[in-house]
A protein has these predicted regions:
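Extreme N-terminal, non-catalytic leader segments
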Residues: 1-16
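Hydrophobic anchor at the beta1->P-loop junction of P-loop NTPases
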Residues: 17-19, 45
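Conserved phosphate-donor/acceptor-positioning beta-strand/loop module used by diverse small-molecule
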Residues: 116-137
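P-loop (Walker A) phosphate-binding loop of NTP-binding proteins
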Residues: 22
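Small-molecule kinase domains that catalyze NTP-dependent phosphoryl transfer to phosphate-bearing small molecules
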Residues: 139-171
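Conserved lysine of the Walker
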Residues: 27
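Hydrophobic positions on the alpha1 helix immediately C-terminal to the Walker A/P-loop
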Residues: 30, 34
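Conserved substrate/cofactor phosphate-moiety recognition/catalytic segment
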Residues: 35-93
Length: 171
């Protein structure tokens, strides 16, 4: 029991962790492990986007970067995630934001929240081989339970637009 108690004392009472990676790479699974280990609150971009903007209609689903995924909608989604995280951190909770964070400016905005609340910041960089991502995407689509609208086409575009972590973000 002493070892268990000691291990709990090493866990910060507050932290902000964000995921980084393309869709279907396993970000939600990694995020859930941290949520379970720390008792953290998790905010998912897939849910918050639809809460904020509604479901995407079938016409928009065929337009890459359109509908609820246009740049303004994405910016609003990240602003919402960051506002939720800031409130939770100020209330003393550890937080995990489950989103792609493909752009450096998105990650920088999350870091600024951690900085302003005096909270440790962690980036969970999630990667997997293309074949594994394709398999996971097919499984997810077959199950039909995941809120993500990502398709193989979306994943290709994400790979192309992903801004790698900077040396400062890796350190």
């Amino acid at each position: 029991y002493a070892n268990l108690a000691e291990s709990y004392s090493a866990i910060p009472s507050r932290l902000l962790a964000i995921t980084h990676g393309i869709s279907a790479v396993g970000k939600s699974s990694v995020a859930m492990r941290l949520v379970e280990a720390l008792g953290a609150l998790r905010f998912r971009s897939d849910f918050e986007r639809k809460r904020l903007l509604g479901e995407q209609d079938s016409e928009q689903q065929n337009t890459l970067g359109g509908g609820i995924y246009n740049p303004n909608a994405s910016a609003a989604t990240y602003q919402r995630l960051h506002a939720l995280a800031a409130d939770a951190l100020q209330a003393g909770f550890p937080v995990v934001i489950d989103a792609t964070y493909l752009k450096s400016e998105q990650r920088q905005a999350a870091w600024q929240i951690a900085e302003s609340t005096g909270t440790p910041f962690l980036i969970l960089d999630c990667q997997a081989p293309d074949e594994v991502v394709a398999t996971w995407l097919k499984q997810r689509q077959a199950e039909g339970l995941d809120p993500s609208d990502a398709t193989a086409e979306v994943i290709l575009a994400q790979r192309k637009n992903l801004e790698p972590l900077s040396p400062e973000e890796i350190a």
